[in-house]
Amino acid sequence: ARVDGLLRQAMAPRPSFADKLRALPLLAGMSRWFPRTVSGRGECQQVVRTGAEASLAALPILKCWPADGGRFVTLPMVNTVDPQTGVRNVGMYRMQLFDDRTTGMHWHIHKTGARHYDAWKRSGRRMPVSVALGGDPAYTYAATAPMPDNMDEYLLAGFLRRRPVKLVKCVTNDIYVPADCDFVIEGYVDPAEEKAVEGPFGDHTGFYSLEDRYPLFHVTALTRRRDAVYPATVVGIPPQEDALSLIHI
């Protein structure tokens, strides 16, 4: 409730100068939790693989249910940016493994990641994407939380843990990710490329979501901590609680 109240206050229109002045203490307090960019390499870049060496075969990606279309990355924090504004988004969109360097990118048309994809398509350029895995659980929660448009998910994560998230620049693109996450899968989506059939997938509803066509994500780098732990979730029929798997690499 406190988070919701703060976000509503921060995003509320302030027509008068007096309204803006009254908002200063709130905004000053929130500034303590804004993400910070740091120079150099982060813990998530202690081991770096690029090019042909950046193989997803190094990850224990799971097939969760018998009729799933394949193996899926199920706890990806997908980092994208709007090409016009530079505003960041972090969302959670499952990723079906097609080969060692290619996955699907399952963002529905109403998700911010899909809107960023459409903007990159209009620009005629490839879309940089970086997928973070693991790290502070606040990151995973923030990636799934219902947030107002243009509100930074890493700000919410900073508020929840009472300290700002430190971000580092990726190795092969200009996306910034949490310095202390476990893995980062760097790559791109080419909006000019034909979409691929993704699914089925045993989903939260207790039913399989059907096959559909989604963009392809191509891997350019795989970085990780030396003591990385791979996170995954297996969703199922309510009221089952989603299972969380932590696999040490």
Show where each model-derived region lies.
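Extended, highly charged
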Residues: 1-216, 220-246
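Calmodulin-binding IQ motif helices
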Residues: 249
